C-alpha cells in the first residue's frame, strides 16, 4: 500500500499531482486515458483517504465514545498526522520516525476511551487526555 501511495509513476497516487491533478482522476492516465478524457474529479479511488486515517494513522471508531488507535507507519514517510472531529470531541494521532523506531502522540477527547495497539505489539486502553508512547 505504501509503494502505491508513494509511486510517482502510473499507477501510483503521486502520479496524479505530479501531472497537474488537484483532484482524483477516474483513470490513472488522466487526460491521456484510452478512449479520451475520463472524469478528472472522481471518487472511485477516493478510498485512499480512509486508508490514510484508518491504517496509516490508525484512527477507527469502535463504538459510542470509544476508539481504536492502531497506526501502521511505513514507506519513506518521516511522520503522519490525522485527527477526527467526533461528536465527543477531537481525537488525534501523530507518529514520527526516530533513530530508534517511532514516537506516537495521541489525544483522546473527554468522556472517551481508546484501545491503543502499536505495531510492536504493545496494547493499552487509555482514557481522555494526551499521551506520548
Stretch-by-stretch model annotation:
Residues 2-133:
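Non-catalytic C-terminal accessory modules of carbohydrate-active enzymes
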